């Protein structure tokens, strides 16, 4: 997304095969598109942590689209930083609790 503010998202390699996508500001449809594009460009075996803890405003439609992204993602994707409403929405839309990761660290043996 060419007009997306670059300060609103950051990609941080955590370890080989693992990446954090950190979003801030408003979580809107453009934000989901950024996440979708990043995830689609990664190898299948990559673990992706989407960190929404710095988001000030969540758009419900964007949260619903995020559920769709999580459903079709080839990479393993975990989301953190959700507020209760967004967590409940994602659960209602079929996202497993194991994908709604409360932290960024995941032991290698836990699969």
Model regions and ranges:
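STAS-like cytosolic regulatory interaction modules
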Residues: 1-111
């Amino acid at each position: 997304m060419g007009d997306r503010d670059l300060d609103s998202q950051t990609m941080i390699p955590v370890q080989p095969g693992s990446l954090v996508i950190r979003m801030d500001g408003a979580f809107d449809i453009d934000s989901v598109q950024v996440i979708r594009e990043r995830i689609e460009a990664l190898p299948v075996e990559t673990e992706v942590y989407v960190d929404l803890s710095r988001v000030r405003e969540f758009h419900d439609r964007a949260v619903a689209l995020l559920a769709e992204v999580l459903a079709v993602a080839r990479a393993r994707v975990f989301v953190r930083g959700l507020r209760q409403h967004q967590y409940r929405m994602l659960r209602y839309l079929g996202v497993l609790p194991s994908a709604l990761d409360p932290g960024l660290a995941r032991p290698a043996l836990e699969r």
